[in-house]
């Protein structure tokens, strides 16, 4: 900041998107809080769990760390496929208002597009929320087009930053999405093509998990959205990095989870 202080962003629910790590202006720009774990009772006996926000820990950080300048959460989450509940969103929003900081919601996989959510979840917005969306999860990552819904002050600030950093903005993405919206094609595309495709893949993955790991102490994070499977090897005797190396020797590729915390 202009006064020499460093501001930081709080992730109230880890694991979180590892790509954020390279976006900070300083090495300690991000603070993350580990989740509570809720073991789920599934109707078919599938061993699943869900990460939930530890709100006591979140408020403790907000109350004692004046460097926190924003809350940030992805919904659905890369890498777990977690979709925080409507109640969790409301609670985060209330905390953001209480401590006079914005709530950033990374909505790259969410509604209304690409709409890759497989559970009940409502999209919410107010002037204290910064809602971010992307065309990349529609299969158009090369267009490098993002959409930010925020109050006028935030949008003007982003415009000034882009004016300084982006000398030749990409016009293809905005033009394409404008046409899709104006002609009423975008939402049907998401509902009738994108969502069924990925939901079917998720159901296949869950069935394979149940078959392969039925007798092992392995749990699957409930697939509520996005494109990922997150496995918890409960009581594992080795670290995730070592598991990654051992599986790679067998031509099986995973991503070790410790980097996302």
Predicted feature locations:
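Short beta-strand segments
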Residues: 12-14, 72-75, 104-107, 133, ...
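Conserved core segment of the aminotransferase class I/II
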Residues: 5-12, 25, 35, 39-42, ...
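Conserved core of the PLP fold type I
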Residues: 1-98, 104-126, 130
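Conserved C-terminal alpha-helix-loop-beta "cap" of PLP-dependent enzymes
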Residues: 217, 230-261
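Conserved glycine-rich beta-strand-loop-beta hairpin in the small C-terminal domain of fold type I
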Residues: 192-206, 218-233
């Amino acid at each position: 900041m202009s006064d020499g202080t460093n501001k930081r962003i709080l992730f109230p629910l880890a694991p979180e998107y590892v790509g954020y790590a390279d976006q900070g202006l300083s090495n300690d720009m991000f603070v993350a809080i580990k989740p509570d774990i809720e073991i789920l009772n599934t109707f078919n006996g599938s061993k699943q769990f869900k990460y939930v926000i530890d709100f006591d820990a979140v408020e403790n950080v907000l109350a004692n760390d004046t460097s926190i300048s924003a809350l940030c959460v992805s919904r659905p989450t890369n890498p777990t496929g977690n979709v925080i509940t409507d109640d969790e969103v409301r609670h985060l929003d209330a905390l953001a208002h209480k401590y006079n900081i914005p709530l950033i919601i990374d909505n790259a996989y969410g509604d209304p597009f690409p709409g890759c959510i497989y559970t009940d979840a409502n999209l919410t917005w107010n002037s204290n929320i910064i809602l971010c969306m992307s065309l990349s999860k529609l299969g158009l990552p090369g267009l490098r087009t993002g959409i930010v819904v925020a109050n006028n002050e935030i949008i003007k600030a982003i415009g000034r930053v882009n004016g300084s950093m982006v000398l030749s903005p990409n016009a293809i993405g905005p033009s394409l999405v404008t046409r899709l919206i104006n002609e009423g094609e975008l939402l049907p595309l998401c509902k009738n093509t994108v969502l069924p495709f990925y939901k079917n893949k998720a159901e296949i993955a869950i069935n394979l998990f149940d078959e392969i790991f039925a007798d092992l102490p392995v749990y699957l994070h409930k697939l509520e959205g996005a494109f990922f499977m997150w496995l918890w090897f409960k009581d594992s005797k080795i670290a995730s990095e070592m598991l990654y190396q051992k599986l790679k020797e067998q031509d099986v590729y995973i991503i070790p989870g410790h980097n996302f915390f």
